[in-house]
């Protein structure tokens, strides 16, 4: 691996040590670093504009939120994603800034494993026509919004009604997202490599309605 896309938490202020390290790696190890159009203004000149067919890997600098945003770029460019934790919560990150040089050496020597993660495809329809489509690495949430009342939920699997209840909302979570919002709402933890998802009702009116794994 020689060509790396760089994705940053735009609110992170202590960028100078990171850019100095990347410049050193660029110069001493002949590595090429590229920025993405939405973050172009954040980077010095040696980090060039992205070339789609050039990327080998994307490096995400930040916490879990930054990693989740970068995951969409990983999907778009069809390359692996590695997280470098700069935030308070780095559950999804494999490396830290102090380990970055060693981690990149391992990538160059092909001393790594790519772990496949499940994605959710979410489609919102109105009058049976799609009005919104997106992919999610962690979860999709149906929520009552600003309304003070419960909403009626009917959940189907393979066109069969599984549960009907009144609640504040519903979380549909991948194994990756099972340790986040779903867990805080009483859902179980799934192994990251499982081919399954969790449906977690938010404050259901009936106590017998519990989180379900599919």
Which sequence ranges carry the predicted segments?
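ATP/NTP phosphate-donor binding region
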Residues: 1-57, 97-113, 123-134
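Redox-cofactor binding/interface segments in oxidoreductases and associated redox assembly factors
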Residues: 6, 60, 172
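Short glycine/serine/threonine-rich phosphate/pyrophosphate-binding segments
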Residues: 15, 66-70, 179-184
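Proline-centered loop/turn at the N-terminus of a beta-strand
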Residues: 32, 78-80
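Hydrophobic/aromatic beta-strand patches that form the interior of the parallel beta-sheet core
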Residues: 59, 82-84
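N-terminal glycine-rich "phosphate-gripper" loop used for MgATP/nucleotide binding
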Residues: 60-64, 71-73
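Catalytic core of DAGKc-family lipid kinases
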Residues: 89-168
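Gly/Ser/Thr-rich active-site loops/lids in small-molecule metabolic enzymes
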Residues: 164-168, 172-208
């Amino acid at each position: 691996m020689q060509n790396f896309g760089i994705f940053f938490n735009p609110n992170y202020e202590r960028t100078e040590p990171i850019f100095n390290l990347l410049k050193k790696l660029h110069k001493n190890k002949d590595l090429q670093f590229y920025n993405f159009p939405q973050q172009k203004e954040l980077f010095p000149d040696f980090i060039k504009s992205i070339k789609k067919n050039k990327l080998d890997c994307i490096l995400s600098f930040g916490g879990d939120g930054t990693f989740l945003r970068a995951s969409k770029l990983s999907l778009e460019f069809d390359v692996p994603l590695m997280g470098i934790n700069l935030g308070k919560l780095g559950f999804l990150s494999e490396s830290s800034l102090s380990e970055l040089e060693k981690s990149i050496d391992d990538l160059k020597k092909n001393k790594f494993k790519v772990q496949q993660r499940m994605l959710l495809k979410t489609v919102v329809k109105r009058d049976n026509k799609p009005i919104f489509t997106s992919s999610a690495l962690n979860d999709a949430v149906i929520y009552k919004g600003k309304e003070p009342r419960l909403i009626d939920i009917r959940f189907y699997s393979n066109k069969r009604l599984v549960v009907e209840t009144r609640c504040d909302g519903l979380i549909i979570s991948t194994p990756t997202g099972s340790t986040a919002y779903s867990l805080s709402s009483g859902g179980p933890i799934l192994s990251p490599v499982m081919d399954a998802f969790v449906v977690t009702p938010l404050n259901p009116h009936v106590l017998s309605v519990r989180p379900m794994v599919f």
